């Protein structure tokens, strides 16, 4: 065979391979674009809903702060915090975190003179039950019971605080029963600060929700979700969670319950998770989520990260397996 003929064959093969590659790339981009189009309507709906909830809650919290109502509430319950080995001033940190978010609690904790023991206890309590109003609204949207979520998170926080006070070495922190007076800015300044912060939050929320929903859809489209599920399969069995909830569990632990809930809504909307599996996941992530940024911030304040993380994970495991037992008994004895 002549050299020129071989060159022609090789050239034809290169053209054929190039054509096949182009077709594959064209097909890949088509699948990506279709996946993005599919998530846009649901993402917009979720963003609008979460935006309304966020504006209402943050505005209400701004008023509570402006009129110094949160310090009054914390002063009222501060004696109870002796049960957790905490000074009364930490009540403001817990109440702020409970109704607002972790950052509010962290701001208060940073002003207090607390040792590692006290920071570990209050951090565990805050991470169990922060952003109660917003995150309960998100979980309710997934089908969870509001009463169950509030009781689970609140009682878990109180129990773990009491438990850690009993088992951690060292002495309870010295009692400080008064909370520092809050400086109040003019309402116009307070309102402008709230408006700017809320607008920034809404933009960030929209970007993150779109990005997560697109990522989740692409992972499903290209079969990567199955790999993630197989990788986390042993861990999901330990937690008592369905294997196909691996990605949602991962999202909730990395970016938090609010954004994780947005992805859950997208998943539930497509019927990917049965109701009971959703309830089990809700129970777990309600008290153990945001285990990257929030946990790191609490550690920076002096908390012991592995204690804060492990006690919440253990509590989540107990609660989920207890809920599985409840489902088993309901099915066996036809309980309603």
PLM regions: where:
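Selected transmembrane alpha-helices and immediately adjacent juxtamembrane segments
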Residues: 21-80, 154-159, 163-237, 314, ...
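Juxtamembrane "helix exit" motif at the C-terminal ends of alpha-helical transmembrane segments
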Residues: 60-70, 104-109, 220, 291-300, ...
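Alpha-helical membrane-embedding segments
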Residues: 103-125, 151-163, 182-185, 212-219, ...
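N-terminal amphipathic/basic-hydrophobic helices that include classical n-h-c signal peptides
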Residues: 1-24
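Hydrophobic alpha-helical transmembrane segments
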Residues: 60-72, 91-105, 145-153, 196, ...
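Alpha-helical membrane segments and immediately flanking helix-loop junctions
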Residues: 87-144, 239-298
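Transmembrane helix-loop-helix hairpins in multi-pass inner-membrane proteins
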Residues: 129-185, 293, 298-330, 335
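Hydrophobic faces of alpha-helical transmembrane segments in multi-pass integral membrane proteins
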Residues: 52, 56, 60, 69, ...
